[in-house]
Amino acid sequence: GCAQFFKGENDLSNLISLENGTIYISATETALHCYLFQAMEEFNSLYPNVRFKILNNSTTESVNAVKEGKVDLAFVSANLQVAKPLRMKILRKYHDILISGNRFGELKDDGKEVSLKELVSYPWISLTAETITRRFLNEYFEKNSLTFTPDMELATTDMILPAVRHNLGLGFIPAEFADAELKSGQVFEIKVKEKLPERNIILIYDMEYPQSIAAKEFQKFLKEKEM
């Protein structure tokens, strides 16, 4: 409707070429940190005049933004299926790690693996119950015959790291989020015996939606990046 018309009009006036194009993207936090920021940096070095307009949304909101024509592309971080005319493409895998602050230093044992059963009595930090990540963790605990009942629930992934750093509990986050704090020793990784499955960063787009020159070129760039 209106959103598509407004965006279409904006595209026509601005997207004569790659010299002044705009790419509209909806992305989850994890997709941004684990893939998209790096990809945009590389693309920007080739096409410095292309602008990005980024909405930071949940997976569900990002898929809906593509459906409604609000964005050209969505980058999400959950294993999901989409129905035509939407298409999805797996861009890369990523894995979550379990981290702790120094309050629970007894779990820092030179690479020794700890079972989930041993960890379940500790305080836990996680995302809220309606999120895909939380459902993923609930299933992981259930598969290991345990119930996941976090003591603290947060709205976004990037809030988990400071909460862990302040010794409020243990938390799973994508490895990329914790690099600096792991190196500085503010948090440490707990090796868990029961391996958490890898997850995917996924690109979603609408086959029937007319995309800008810049958005098409960005997709082509991402495809070549995989080779």
Which role fits each region the language model picked out?
Residues 1-14:
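Alpha-helical "hinge/linker" immediately C-terminal to small N-terminal DNA-binding modules
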Residues 35, 188-227:
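A late-sequence structural motif
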Residues 107-108, 122-144, 211-213, 219:
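Secondary-structure junction motif
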